[in-house]
């Protein structure tokens, strides 16, 4: 079985695949101080609840945008699961698509993994919007190559920043308000976040589509993923599909392609 690890700025997600079938998935908040042993304690316990043991794992793949966790997660695989993980971005790890940007080394591993899964599942050209700590719009052109994209602050990060710098503004939950005009501070902040963010998403997607396919032929497919994408997709008609497993599936595909070489 394959252990796939996606280390993001907000969460680290683990999944076990048996062939194409996902046997289990677990999530922990990202903490740069967490050690390999600490990861192992809770992960092995949760795997056991699914009838899985470390001996079931024969290979691993890691995508990390958190340098402080790349080492501990590599050690986790080596010391507790008996395998050295394939790491997205390492020399020799092939993605199966070309990275056509000014400096390919700058592209975040998570963005590339999403692109790999998207182009294997949906017809290009396409855009993957991933709403997390940051919000990324990742573009795959009509040839199936990664063509760049847009990076913006995520909604939680934006709200936290507003709360920190404006003394009288409270922390609020992110939700879709019933109306645009807020009758109080909390309602006004929630409206500003939801509708402002929805407007940003639609504005950026409209402009990307115009650049990527000026005539609309071929049409551009928009795929949403990430923890908050479903909420914001409800406010927009431009997201064609929501694919919660996109990143994990991309990791499985990358491992599959490289292991077969």
UniProtKB/Swiss-Prot annotation:
GO terms, molecular function: ATP binding; metal ion binding; pantothenate kinase activity
Cofactors required: NH4(+); K(+)
Alphabetically ordered keywords of this record: ATP-binding, Coenzyme A biosynthesis, Cytoplasm, Kinase, Metal-binding, Nucleotide-binding, Potassium, Transferase
Organism per entry: Rhodospirillum centenum (strain ATCC 51521 / SW)
A Pfam family assignment: Pan_kinase
Binding-site positions, substrate: 108-111, 185
Sequence positions that bind ATP: 6-13, 133
Its job: Catalyzes the phosphorylation of pantothenate (Pan), the first step in CoA biosynthesis.
The protein's name: Type III pantothenate kinase
Location (main, coarse): cytoplasm
Gene Ontology CC: one annotated term: cytoplasm
Record field: catalytic activity: (R)-pantothenate + ATP = (R)-4'-phosphopantothenate + ADP + H(+)
SUPFAM superfamilies documented for this protein: Actin-like ATPase domain (SSF53067)
Enzyme Commission no: 2.7.1.33
Database matches in PANTHER family: TYPE III PANTOTHENATE KINASE (PTHR34265:SF1)
Localization, UniProt: Cytoplasm
